[in-house]
């Protein structure tokens, strides 16, 4: 039995959502082959860092390679479209054909079934994040053989909106949380009285960055009492242009003026490892954002939140904006000083209980680490698959 965990992205932010499962599978005595497949050097480095001695010993590491044609195409189009990410499947079909199970964090892997005909390959989706956006619950989710999810909110929406069969969904908690169990928050800006994490999403139709981001930075430059960690979604500045397909938009994140880079109370991180490993969501006192699912990681410990509705959405009562119930929603950075001034009081009098309810509906956590729960599901699915294969083989032999 060959089970592979695929990491195929420009950035490392998805690794923490499924690599802990591979590690738990290896430590739990799974008797099949466990493989981690990466598509670039950045991902390989992150996998080796988190996986330690298991990578290359109990867990085989395969580095997928693009063809020369893909490399040429990618060099021309990579500023707009992730061609290498899309074509890596075609270029490595023999590897994917050799697998029984493929565990993935994203949906482009469904190309293996839909375009390349690998219908016998069982693909398990771990998801990456526990956010509320509709794209996380689109019909593509029903194309997976099994989906692992964090809690009842996600399961219920997958069944109701994506059409996933209830038998094809398992609640396992949130494996990424296993990586920070017992860790203490870092003090990122020690001179600041309070630290705010500004975490805008890359999607132009949802993000506050394109319209209001520089005004947000300006506010903190002039208000040194509050420290600012500007750690946007790692894909906001990854390419020259941001292209979204769920609602087609193209925009440019642009440059960050030098004056913000020199601010003593401003920490800017556009995509380092810390942007993906919960360092900043643990370290901040207040969350400021728009559509990123990292809000739910921030709620691991309830704290004040502020949301910037830069597009004037009518959001109340809409499940795609459920996370905005965790704090005050403002329409402009001009409202930020007052929102920050009352954030602590509003948190205690209005939002703390709501946050705890939201966290409980989003994450089903217990004393068993989430990665071990996920590994148990994969082991069961693999055993069921092996049993069915043996029965089919015996039946074929008996009728021969």
Stretches with model-predicted labels:
Residues 6-24, 35-181:
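Active-site and donor-binding regions of nucleotide-sugar-utilizing enzymes
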Residues 121, 286, 302-306:
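Structural loop-to-beta junction motif characteristic of Rossmann-like glycosyltransferase folds
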């Amino acid at each position: 039995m060959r089970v592979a965990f695929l990491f195929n992205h420009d950035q490392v932010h998805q690794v923490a959502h499924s690599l802990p499962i591979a590690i738990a599978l290896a430590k739990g005595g799974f008797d099949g082959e466990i493989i981690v497949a990466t598509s670039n050097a950045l991902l390989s480095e992150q996998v080796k860092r988190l996986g330690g001695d298991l990578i290359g010993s109990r867990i085989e590491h395969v580095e997928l390679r693009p063809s020369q044609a893909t490399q040429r195409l990618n060099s021309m189009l990579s500023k707009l479209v992730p061609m290498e990410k899309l074509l890596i499947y075609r270029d490595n079909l023999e590897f994917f054909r050799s697998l029984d199970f493929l565990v993935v964090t994203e949906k482009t892997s469904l190309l293996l079934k839909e375009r390349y005909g690998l219908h016998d390959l069982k693909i398990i989706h771990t998801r990456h994040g526990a956010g509320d956006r509709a794209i996380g619950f689109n019909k593509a989710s029903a194309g997976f053989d099994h989906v692992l999810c964090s809690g009842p909110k996600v399961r219920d929406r997958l069944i109701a909106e994506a059409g996933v069969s209830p038998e094809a969904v398992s609640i396992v908690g949130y494996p990424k949380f296993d990586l920070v169990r017992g860790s203490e928050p870092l003090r990122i800006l020690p001179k600041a009285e309070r630290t705010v994490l500004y975490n805008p999403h890359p999607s132009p139709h949802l993000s506050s960055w394109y319209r209001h981001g520089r005004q947000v930075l300006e506010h903190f430059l002039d208000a040194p009492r509050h420290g600012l960690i500007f750690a946007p979604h790692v894909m906001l500045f990854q390419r020259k242009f941001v292209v979204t397909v769920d609602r087609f938009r193209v925009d440019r994140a642009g440059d960050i003026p030098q004056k913000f880079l020199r601010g003593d109370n401003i920490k800017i991180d556009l995509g380092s490892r810390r942007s993906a490993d919960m360092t900043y969501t643990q370290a901040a006192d207040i969350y400021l954002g728009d559509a990123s699912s990292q809000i739910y990681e921030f709620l691991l410990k309830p704290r004040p939140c502020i949301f910037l509705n830069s597009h004037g959405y009518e959001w109340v009562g809409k499940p795609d904006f459920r996370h905005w119930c965790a704090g005050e929603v403002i329409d402009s950075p001009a409202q930020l000083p007052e929102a920050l001034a009352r954030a602590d009081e509003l948190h205690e009098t209005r939002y703390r209980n709501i946050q705890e309810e939201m966290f409980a509906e989003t994450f089903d956590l217990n004393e068993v680490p989430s990665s071990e729960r996920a590994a148990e599901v994969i082991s069961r699915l693999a055993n069921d698959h092996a049993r069915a294969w043996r029965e089919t083989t015996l039946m074929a032999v008996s009728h021969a």
